[in-house]
Curated annotation (Swiss-Prot):
Its EC number is 2.7.7.60. It comes from Klebsiella pneumoniae subsp. pneumoniae (strain ATCC 700721 / MGH 78578). Homodimer. This is 2-C-methyl-D-erythritol 4-phosphate cytidylyltransferase. The lineage of its organism: Bacteria, Pseudomonadati, Pseudomonadota, Gammaproteobacteria, Enterobacterales. The record marks R20, K27 as: Transition state stabilizer. Coiled coil: none annotated.
Length: 236
């Protein structure tokens, strides 16, 4: 399968700091077990043989990445990221001219499951636009009054999904959409939103809800629990 699969590479934007973690260390460099969150995230991508190369966009002047064993991996390339996520992703894409399809994965999302990644990668066989891992909303959703904490109304959760990563698109399409969206001042919160802005409709690929992003201090313990459970299941 790997011999006929189109060229797939990945970009991991890792130039952010994550101030909500309330630590002096950028969250992607916090440790879970004997690896950083970033190392867990990248290892999940490289575990699939179809992913040929991973470009990691770090903050200019970052001194932490070069100290990781990951920095010497033959399939890893590091580039300087930008002020915003979209700038970092574009910098990564420019370093991957050979890629036909590109995964974009959060540096702080260490719990990606291989079966989810495999289903997402299969999109390149059926889609011209690509798609994202996502999880259906299960909780009751409330919208607050503007600028307040008072409830304005309950939001119908039918057809609502939590956007996850990786997100997976044809490289040229993603470059074009990100460039246009940035040039026109659009608000881009993830790569799919750039495609949406340009009139495309990526697919939602159901993924596991435990593919969490470490954003707040309490997320670190939860991610450690999920990773430990996953290792135990693999050994069983």
């Amino acid at each position: 399968m790997a011999a006929t699969f189109p060229g797939v590479c990945a970009v991991v934007p890792a130039a952010g700091f994550g101030r909500r973690m309330q630590t002096e260390c950028p969250k992607q460099y916090l440790s879970i077990g004997n690896k950083t969150i970033l190392e867990h995230a990248v290892a999940a991508l490289l575990a699939d043989a179809r992913v040929q190369r991973v470009v990691i966009a770090v903050s200019p002047g970052d001194r932490r990445f070069s100290q990781l064993p990951l920095a010497q991996h033959p399939q890893i390339t590091v580039v300087d990221g930008g002020a915003e996520r979209a700038d970092s992703v574009l910098a990564g894409l420019q370093a991957l001219p050979e890629a036909q399809w590109v995964l974009v994965h959060d540096a702080a999302r260490p719990c990606l499951h291989q079966d989810d990644l495999s289903r997402l990668l299969s999109l390149c066989e059926t889609s011209r636009v690509g798609g994202i891992l996502a999880a259906p909303v299960r909780d009751t959703m409330k919208r607050a009054e503007p600028g307040k904490t008072a409830i304005a109304h309950t939001v119908d959760r039918n057809d609502l999904w939590h956007a996850l990563t990786p997100q997976f698109f044809p490289r040229e399409l993603l470059v074009d959409c990100l460039t246009r969206a940035l040039n026109e001042g659009a608000t881009i919160t993830d790569e799919a939103s750039a495609l949406e802005y340009c009139g495309f409709h990526p697919q939602l690929v159901a993924g596991r809800a435990d593919n969490i992003k470490v954003t707040r201090p309490e997320d670190l313990a939860l991610a450690e629990f999920y990773l430990t459970r996953s290792r135990h299941q693999e050994k069983a």
